[in-house]
Design a protein with these regions (language model features):
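Intrinsically disordered, low-complexity basic tails/linkers immediately adjacent to helix-turn-helix/homeobox/MYB/SANT
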Residues: 57-65
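Short, charged recognition helix plus adjacent turn
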Residues: 38, 67-80
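The DNA-recognition helices of helix-turn-helix-type DNA-binding domains
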Residues: 32, 43, 70-74
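A short, Lys/Arg-rich alpha-helix, primarily the initiator
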Residues: 1-23
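Short, basic-rich loop-to-helix N-cap that marks the start of a DNA-contacting helix
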Residues: 43-57
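Short alpha-helical DNA-recognition segment
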Residues: 19-38
Length: 80
């Protein structure tokens, strides 16, 4: 799993925990539905920090809480 896949999986899990749809997340986080769809479908190769912060605000969690999860614990360093 790469970083973008881990971000998408984390968003899916947070939505699932709250019984939210991506559309509801879009509403509460003030992030366009197309942006969320792009992240979840793997089309966005580098979701921006500001976007992730807005999503965290919608979930009412910190960036630290977002990235402190099993999805990110198993990531290997990406070298390009």
């Amino acid at each position: 799993m790469n970083t973008c896949e881990a971000i998408a999986e984390r968003i899916r899990n947070l939505c699932r925990e709250r019984n939210w749809t991506p559309n509801h997340l879009s509403y509460v986080a003030a992030v366009p539905q197309a942006t969320i769809k792009s992240i979840l479908n793997g089309e966005s190769k580098n979701p921006g920090t500001v976007t992730i912060k807005k999503l965290c605000d919608g979930f009412e969690i910190t960036l630290g809480e977002f990235f402190s999860s099993a999805e990110f614990d198993a990531l290997e360093q990406e070298i390009r």
